[in-house]
């Protein structure tokens, strides 16, 4: 088998859907016994108390009864295709979007609530 360069692998990843990449990550985790989760550094709390984060990760916790409406909201917010959005909803709890400003996250929460879903950050 020919050895693949890092560029070859990256070029292959660019052609994959988000669902295919998710499956690849799970296969790598299983094969090598590792986790793709980033290590979390524990920092000391500021003396004045913890300030609200400026950016959050919006996580879909519960889909509720109207899955189709939730898929539409996911597609609108993320720009994902139908199959990728459906997979994200089917695999709840799942991350919808990372690095979201708090005000935008509140708007997303409202959109998901209108569709019957529950999100948190």
Curated annotation (Swiss-Prot):
Transmembrane helix recorded as keyword: no
A Gene Ontology BP annotation from the UniProt entry: translation
GO cellular component, one term: cytosolic large ribosomal subunit
Stored SUPFAM superfamilies: ClpS-like, Ribosomal protein L7/12, oligomerisation (N-terminal) domain
UniProt keywords, alphabetically: Ribonucleoprotein, Ribosomal protein
HAMAP family, A to Z: Ribosomal_bL12 (MF_00368)
Biological role stated in the UniProt entry: Forms part of the ribosomal stalk which helps the ribosome interact with GTP-bound translation factors. Is thus essential for accurate translation.
NCBIfam families reported in the protein's UniProt record: L12
UniProt name for this protein: Large ribosomal subunit protein bL12
Lineage: Bacteria, Bacillati, Mycoplasmatota, Mycoplasmoidales, Mycoplasmoidaceae
UniProt gene name: rplL
């Amino acid at each position: 088998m020919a050895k693949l360069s890092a560029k070859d692998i990256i070029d292959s990843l660019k052609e994959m859907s988000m669902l295919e990449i998710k499956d690849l990550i799970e296969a790598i985790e299983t094969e090598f016994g590792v986790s793709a989760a980033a290590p979390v550094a524990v920092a000391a709390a500021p003396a004045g108390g913890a300030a609200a984060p400026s950016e959050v990760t919006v996580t879909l916790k519960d889909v509720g009864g109207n899955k189709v409406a939730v898929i539409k909201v996911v597609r609108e917010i993320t720009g994902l295709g139908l199959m990728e959005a459906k997979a994200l909803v089917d695999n709840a709890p799942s991350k919808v979007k990372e690095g979201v400003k708090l005000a935008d996250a509140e708007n997303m929460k409202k959109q998901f609530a209108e569709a019957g879903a529950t999100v948190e950050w």
